[in-house]
Each structure stands twice: as structure tokens, then as C-alpha cells.
């Protein structure tokens, strides 16, 4: 085992790793604001991506499309040289499998459509034993229909 790698500072990157991220695209960035706690906000994510040399970042939130936010980031912070993208998450917050959300998202510039994640039957069934599930994935209190 290479103990020097373990002892290296977290801020020191192996040059091979740095070369890999140059021009890369992060396809799954959970920045904020969000109803769930996030480590950094969308602008901080853009700045960190710029510093790392990434070409683009795709922002994902389980509750809303960040596409309008990416439009503003790209317009006002183009000097950072990172293209910010987003898509449409088809969880309950946007009506689930909602063709209208997809159509409007695409018109706004969405680049990806995510099938339901935390609101899918499979995800709920998998996590039903977790008593903190609704803390991790906030849910609506009442059915709409």
C-alpha cells in the first residue's frame, strides 16, 4: 500500500486525476438551494468546477428543475468557462410522470429527464424500514387528489 498517498493532503491531487477532470462533464451534481441539506450552492458548484477545469456540470434536484437557474448562471457567469445544465426530475413535486413538466422543461433548455427516484414505488419499498426516510426525502403531507 502506498502510505504516502494516504498521508497526502485532501487538497493535493495526483496529476493524473487533475488531467482526467480537465474538460470533463459532471452529470450529477446535487447543489442547492434545495429542501434537502446541500454542501454548496449552484454558484459555488460552478466556481469549483471552473477551478477544477471542468467543461460542464449538470445540476440535479429531486424537487425541481434547475434549468432556469442554469440559464442565469450561464448568462451572468460565463467568464468562469463552465456550461451549467439541468433537467426535469419526474418526482411527485412536479406531478410524477408529467408530460407537461417535460415539455416545459425542454422549452426552457432542460437537457435530461430523470424518471422518478425517491417517489417511485421501488425506492419507497426499498426504504420503508428506514424511519428517517421522510427526513431524508421530504414528502407532501396530503394527497392532492
Regions found by a protein language model. Give the residues of each.
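An N-terminally biased module of ancient metal coordination in phosphate/nucleic-acid-related enzymes
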Residues: 2-83
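Short histidine/acidic/glycine/proline-rich micro-motifs that form metal-
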Residues: 31-33, 90-93
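Extended substrate/RNA-proximal surfaces in nucleic-acid metabolism proteins
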Residues: 80-83, 91-145
Amino acid at each position: 500500500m502506498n502510505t504516502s498517498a494516504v498521508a497526502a493532503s485532501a487538497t493535493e491531487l495526483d496529476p493524473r486525476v487533475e488531467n482526467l477532470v480537465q474538460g470533463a462533464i459532471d452529470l450529477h451534481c446535487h447543489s442547492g438551494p434545495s429542501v434537502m441539506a446541500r454542501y454548496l450552492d449552484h454558484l459555488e458548484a460552478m466556481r469549483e468546477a471552473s477551478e477544477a477545469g471542468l467543461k460542464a456540470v449538470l445540476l440535479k434536484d429531486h424537487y425541481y428543475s434547475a434549468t432556469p437557474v442554469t440559464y442565469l448562471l450561464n448568462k451572468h457567469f460565463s467568464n468562469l468557462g463552465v456550461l451549467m445544465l439541468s433537467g426535469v426530475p419526474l418526482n411527485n413535486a412536479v406531478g410524477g410522470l408529467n408530460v407537461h413538466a417535460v415539455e416545459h422543461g425542454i422549452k426552457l433548455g432542460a437537457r435530461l429527464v430523470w424518471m422518478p427516484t425517491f417517489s417511485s414505488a421501488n425506492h419507497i419499498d426499498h426504504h420503508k424500514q428506514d424511519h428517517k426516510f421522510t427526513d431524508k426525502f421530504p414528502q407532501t403531507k396530503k394527497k392532492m387528489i
